[in-house]
């Protein structure tokens, strides 16, 4: 009887641990954020050129800040989640990109990795995460556009990161060189959004200082570059 009781207790503890881990994994990737929207999204119609934007708060805030852009381009679908890093993008890439059957995915990477949002920053690992997303997309017949990390003079929520701009430049250079080698279109948001002194996001394009999040004017700059890049793929 004692042995059965011990086995029962062990099973309960194991099940609790598995459930806890599952909840932790789900909350880390935030699969629930777009689960309902993904289910309700119809399959692309014949001739529809669906584009999915994968990213963080910069992508997440875009439809709220510039809803008219998405009304004019209903084929462009945002799948950004505020605060997320490339590690989380990779976890939810199948659910929030591949399952939507887009023709193109645009990946805006890096900001929150550098801001240490999910742990210590490792440029090579962030780069590898980007490469893995590209591999998954291409294996599923999805074209890829890589979009640079935007200028970041610092992070208000992470003051200990004192070399943000140097890290942004280094990561962008690495991804851009690889994109050129692989003939993957690359959008240089960084240069277009940089301040005149090269130290931060242009204040005219930012909602905050140091600039991390674009305002409506900043998104309009990004929209022009995005449409140019997409136009080259059609």
List the model feature ranges, each with a label.
Residues 151-234:
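Catalytic His-Asp segment of secreted/periplasmic serine-dependent ester chemistry enzymes
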Residues 140-143, 184:
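A short helix->loop->beta-strand "cap" motif at the edges of active sites that frequently abuts
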Residues 106-110, 130-131, 145-147:
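Conserved, well-ordered alpha-helix/loop/beta-strand core segments that scaffold catalytic motifs
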Residues 22-103:
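Serine-esterase "nucleophile elbow" of acetyl-processing enzymes
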Residues 114-119, 123, 154-158:
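Extracytoplasmic/secreted cell-surface and envelope-processing proteins
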Residues 78-82, 109-110, 114, 118-119:
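Cell-envelope and extracellular/periplasmic
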Residues 1-24:
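Bacterial Sec-dependent N-terminal signal peptides
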Residues 122-131, 165-171:
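Charged helix-capping and loop-helix junction motifs
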């Amino acid at each position: 009887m004692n042995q059965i009781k011990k086995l029962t207790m062990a099973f309960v503890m194991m099940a609790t641990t598995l459930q806890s881990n599952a909840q932790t994994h789900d909350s880390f990737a935030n699969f629930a954020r777009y689960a309902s929207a993904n289910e309700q999204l119809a399959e692309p119609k014949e001739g529809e050129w669906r584009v999915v934007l994968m990213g963080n708060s910069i992508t997440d805030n875009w439809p709220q800040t510039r809803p008219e852009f998405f009304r004019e381009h209903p084929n462009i679908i945002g799948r950004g989640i505020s605060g997320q890093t490339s590690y989380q993008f990779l976890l939810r890439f199948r659910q929030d990109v591949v399952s939507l059957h887009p023709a193109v995915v645009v990946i805006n990477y890096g900001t929150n990795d550098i801001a240490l949002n999910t742990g210590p920053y490792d440029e090579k690992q962030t780069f590898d995460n980007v490469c893995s997303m590209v591999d998954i997309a291409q294996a599923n017949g999805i074209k890829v556009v890589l979009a640079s990390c935007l200028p970041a003079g610092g992070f208000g929520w992470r003051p200990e990161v004192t070399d943000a701009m140097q890290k942004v430049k280094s990561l962008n250079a690495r991804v851009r060189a690889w994109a050129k080698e692989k003939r993957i279109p690359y959008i240089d948001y960084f240069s277009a959004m940089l301040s005149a002194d090269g130290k931060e996001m242009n204040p005219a394009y930012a909602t905050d200082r140091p600039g991390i999040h674009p305002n409506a004017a900043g998104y309009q700059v990004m929209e022009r570059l995005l449409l140019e890049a997409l136009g080259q793929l059609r």
